[in-house]
């Protein structure tokens, strides 16, 4: 009563192919044994495991097959989507410090039908591998302590051309855009079986539409818009390119560079 908007998150660990285990612990689930955890949100560990491996190994099918199991959850949109946390190898390390793969992961996290959680430091590509203990993935935030030689909060010690600053600016653009998108917060999700390593999905809410195209392959791919006519019809005339790097939208195709992406938003 005192905190009506306060939510509790359950850290439910289940393997990549076990969404039903996670669903058991979600508050709204109707369990046969009558149990209700009263936990509204759970960490989506199956999605974390499959998504991180999808971007590491260029395997778009892992994304598709994982989200195809959303029917198991009564409210998949209430799950926490993560690319890592304090108990896991950092995402930038998982993708072998590949900036292009990292960006695909961030875009997916920001636009899929989950509540995104970004682990501190991942917004500028902190690395950390679980070797002897968890300390390797829980390093100090640069600038979080007096006397730090580098400070990510004000940029001291970093050049604007540094990798860290580039990733930080990228994240600022993505997440500030997301703040204003009700279609991403509350919209439905429609996705398509990947072709040529390209994963395409659409978020819809009333007349608002956002289309996300991710090329998980290390090669240029040309998408024929007629293959996705139900969401891409009239794309060039009726949609605007919002976020992209070196991706071209033509009258009938979308030309994606290696690890290319584009977010399209209806006018």
Q: What kind of region is each of these model predictions?
A:
Residues 187-206:
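Surface beta-strand/loop "capping" patches
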Residues 213-217:
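Asparagine-centered strand-capping/turn motif at beta-strand->loop junctions
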Residues 1-74, 79, 98, 108, ...:
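Active-site-proximal helices and loops of the catalytic beta/alpha 8
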Residues 76-97:
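Active-site clefts of carbohydrate-active enzymes
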Residues 249-267:
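C-terminal beta-strand-rich structural cap/linker in extracellular carbohydrate-active enzymes
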Residues 220-244:
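Beta-strand-rich binding/interaction modules
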Residues 109, 113-127:
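Substrate-binding cleft of secreted/luminal carbohydrate-active enzymes
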Residues 1-4, 84, 114:
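Proline-centered flexible-loop/turn and helix-kink motifs
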């Amino acid at each position: 009563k005192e905190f009506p908007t306060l939510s509790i998150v359950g850290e439910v660990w289940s393997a990549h192919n076990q969404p039903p285990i996670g669903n058991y612990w979600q508050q709204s689930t109707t369990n046969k044994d009558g149990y209700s955890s009263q936990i509204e949100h759970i960490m989506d560990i199956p999605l974390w495991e499959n998504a991180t491996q999808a971007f590491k190994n260029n395997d778009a099918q892992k994304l598709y097959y994982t989200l195809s199991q959303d029917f198991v959850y009564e409210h998949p949109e209430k799950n926490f989507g993560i690319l890592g946390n304090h108990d896991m190898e950092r995402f930038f390390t998982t993708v072998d410090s590949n900036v292009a793969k990292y960006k695909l992961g961030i875009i997916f996290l920001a636009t899929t039908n989950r509540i995104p959680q970004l682990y501190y430091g991942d917004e500028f590509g902190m690395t950390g591998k679980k070797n002897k203990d968890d300390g390797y993935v829980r390093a100090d935030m640069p600038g979080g302590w007096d006397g730090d030689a580098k400070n990510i909060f004000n940029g001291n010690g970093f050049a604007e051309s540094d990798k860290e600053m580039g990733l930080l600016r990228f994240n600022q653009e993505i997440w500030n855009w997301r703040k204003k998108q009700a279609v991403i917060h509350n919209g439905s999700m429609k996705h398509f079986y990947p072709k040529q390593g390209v994963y395409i999905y659409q978020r819809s809410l009333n007349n608002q539409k956002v289309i996300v195209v991710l090329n998980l392959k290390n090669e240029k791919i040309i998408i024929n818009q007629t293959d996705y006519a139900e969401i891409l019809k009239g794309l060039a005339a009726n949609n605007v390119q919002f976020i992209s790097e070196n991706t071209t939208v033509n009258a009938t195709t979308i030309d994606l560079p290696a690890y290319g992406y584009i977010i399209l938003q209806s006018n």
